[in-house]
Each structure stands twice: as structure tokens, then as C-alpha cells.
Amino acid sequence: GVETQTRKLMTVCRMRKTPVIIFINKMDREGRDPFDLLDELEQELEIKVRPLSWPINQGAKFKGVYNIYEQKLDLFTPDKQRVTDKVEVDINSEELDKRVGEENAAKLREDLEIVDGVYPEFEVETYREAEVAPVFFGSALNNFGVQELLNCFVEIAPSPRPTKAEERDVNPEEPKFTGFIFKITANIDPNPRSCIAFCKVCSGKFQRNQPYLHVRQGKSLRFSSISRSE
């Protein structure tokens, strides 16, 4: 179900009209009906939802998801840590029956027909105005469905807004890199000096081992290790 911290976060997002994408996790375990989960999301988070992927069974019989946004079938293999097979397949084709079985294919077609009848057609502008939240299904433990959500996010998310600096506004279209650290997590492993700095990119492109000016300290710094979503 919806956790307490999620409700608090959504309250802030509604106040600021910040668009969100929802990931329904643990589809490789037995759980509630997807439609029941979507109803709970709309009631608890007070936002309209629109599925952009749909699970094919769940628990031990979980076969994967149909990526509605990309019109592709993403097949699931436990412990592979990735989508093991991505197939562009027509929802009414015999190929779908061969891939997931006739019973699962029939249920998927029935569910998608209900999805199209109940939920509004997805529009990017409606999402960017925080009026609807796209929903993806998957298994975070197996890293299944996560990359597909990130790919969609990169494509539909709004561009950064201009950010005020000390002397001027930073335009996100500028080629030169600018950014600010909004969070630092320390002591994440036994090494007492270890930390992760979370940086919002305001313009340009961040590259490793390049000198960057720390404005407050007036020092030039280099960073050899970065992590980002591909």
C-alpha cells in the first residue's frame, strides 16, 4: 500500500505542482490486483493516474510487463538484474500468446482494454502540469522495469527552470556546466571519509576529471567518480 512518507511527499508535490512518476514495486511477489492498487493511489495521493506499463501476472507466475508507452513486451527472468528480452509485438498477435501463454495473453488484452476505457489518454503536457501521474510496474530488487521508467522520465520530464545565481540567472540552455549540491550523504561505508554529494545540473554537461569552480570556497575541484541514470 501507500506508505506514510509517500503521502507526505505527495502533499509537497501538490503544493508545488511538481509532476511525479509512480513505480509499483514487487510484482514478482504475490500481491493485490493492479486495479485495486491504482484506485488506492488516486484516493490516498489525490492525483489522477495513467498506467504506462502493465504487469503480466504476478508472484511466481510473473512473466513481465507490457510497456504501453513503447508498445513493447518486456519479459522477466528472476535474478538477471535487467530486462532479459524486449519484444516489439502487437497486442493482438499470436506472437504474444507464444511469449507469455494463451491465458496470460488473454488476461493482458482484457486488462489493457479496461485501462484504455477507464484512464485518460496520456498527454505529456498534462503530466508536466502535475495533473496526472504515469504509473510503471516492476521489481526493483531485480532491477526490472526501473530503466524503462527512467527512459520515459528523460523523454517526458520538463526542462530545468532558470536558477538564480549570485549575479545572474543561469539558463538551462547554456553550454557551460553549472550546478549546485543540494544533499550530502556521509559515512555510507566503513571508510569514515566516504560520502555522496547529490548535484542538480542547472546547465551544460557534467564530466569526470574536469576542473570545476566551487563558488563559495573559490577553489577548483575535480571529481573522478560519478553516478547517473542512463
Task: Name the predicted role of every residue range.
Residues G1-E230:
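Structural and coupling elements of P-loop NTPases
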